[in-house]
């Protein structure tokens, strides 16, 4: 007697290739487990990139320009001082990031699901590496960010990492521009620094030791000093760390493909964007090609909300 409910029928490689939206969902699930770019920037809207570019303004001082005058005591019937401000409108172009991976006719014929899933995983990994590297490079290239050295290498167990981070937080707060350094800021590190944080004696002494979610027990670093999170990536140098207020530092907006282009997309929701997928035939040899793409425009709008810590 059959059990109820019956198991779902196994799907074949050939059937998957006819469902590009499902491939898009798989890629989104794999990409956004590791990609940090959506955590660095505030997500914009498709309307912001209509026409292939996003217009933005770099943050100004919260005060008026002092020339020709500032607030002052004014005598009766005397002229009042006047101060204005300047605005500069900039444009960030939409970039087309994409890659294709072939699925051979033999893999389809033999239903080699392992080859198909490896192709998906490798495509997702390449998208993550490329997009995150571009985002980090954009942050570091902005002349308006602040750079400060670490007190000592974070590879040394006794280095006061908390002091280095809080100094960077104070730098952000000290801009007096409404940035949050001590509440919800994001710390970005190379993945090799995870082990150094776990071994750091200053952090061990400061963080709870008896809790079930304690970092040495779980292997997951708990945020400290008011941080909203710690993001680990291979896209930043091992001797660098970035602290930023992700709610204002920059904006990333995505241009959707035109329906006539034949791409399919699965919307993952939240701050994430769809990885658009197109499957088409290649006759020499008789392969199927999976193309995955994303069209972002990224702008650093508040470089004062970013601090680069060197020598970690």
Task: Go through each PLM region and give its residues.
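N-terminal alpha-helical "arm" segments
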Residues: 1-39
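Sequence/fold signature of self-assembling virion shell proteins
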Residues: 2-7, 201-312
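Assembly/oligomerization interface modules of large self-assembling protein complexes
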Residues: 29-97
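Residues forming anionic-ligand binding surfaces in small-molecule and nucleic-acid pockets
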Residues: 94-106
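Structural beta-strand/beta-sheet cores of well-ordered domains, especially the beta-sheet scaffolds
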Residues: 99, 183-187, 286-288
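Helix N-cap / beta->alpha transition motif
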Residues: 102-104, 187-193, 245, 301-302
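Alpha-helical scaffold segments that mediate packing/assembly in large oligomeric complexes
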Residues: 103-178, 308-312
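Extended, solvent-exposed, turn-rich assembly/linker loops in the middle of proteins
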Residues: 144-219
